[in-house]
Amino acid sequence: MRKAKPKKRQILSDAVFGSQRVTKFVNHLMYDGKKSMAFNIFYSALEKVRAKLSDEQKSSLEIWEHALNNITPLVEVKSRRVGGATFQVPTEIYPERKETISMKNMIFFARKRDGKSMADKLSAEIVDAFNSQGGAYKKKEDMRKMAEANRAFAYFRF
């Protein structure tokens, strides 16, 4: 176990939207330190989202943030061993972890999609998440259902 809690690193905001949340998402999207390529993928995905949802009054960044909020889980289950039996104990997720889980799920399910480029796949996943559909939304609902099913073990708090 580590001696002290690690310090939080300061994340710089991105150049186009001035948002730290965008930079955090791009950091999760990035492979092999190629951040400029990850930013290009993200911005082109947002342009494609804007084209797909042209009738929406929101900007592409607002659509992306709404999609992230739609797939953000509220509770998760953690394994807890009590007297030889392992229970799945539902616990609330703290805000920073909620955001990280939703970003990673969106990227994971975008990568699993069939499509030409990552920008196409990411834009399709953003549109699906905005409409409360897709793999990332299903994952959130599965987490919620698992926590609901194991609600009886909620008194085994951590």
Curated annotation (Swiss-Prot):
One of its GO terms (biological process) is translation. One of the primary rRNA binding proteins, it binds directly to 16S rRNA where it nucleates assembly of the head domain of the 30S subunit. Is located at the subunit interface close to the decoding center, probably blocks exit of the E-site tRNA. Keywords: Ribonucleoprotein, Ribosomal protein, RNA-binding, rRNA-binding, tRNA-binding. GO terms for molecular function: rRNA binding; structural constituent of ribosome; tRNA binding. InterPro entries: Ribosomal_uS7 (IPR000235), Ribosomal_uS7_bac/org-type (IPR005717), Ribosomal_uS7_dom (IPR023798), Ribosomal_uS7_dom_sf (IPR036823). NCBIfam families: rpsG_bact (TIGR01029). Pfam families: Ribosomal_S7. This is Small ribosomal subunit protein uS7. Part of the 30S ribosomal subunit. Contacts proteins S9 and S11. Belongs to the universal ribosomal protein uS7 family. GO terms for cellular component: small ribosomal subunit.
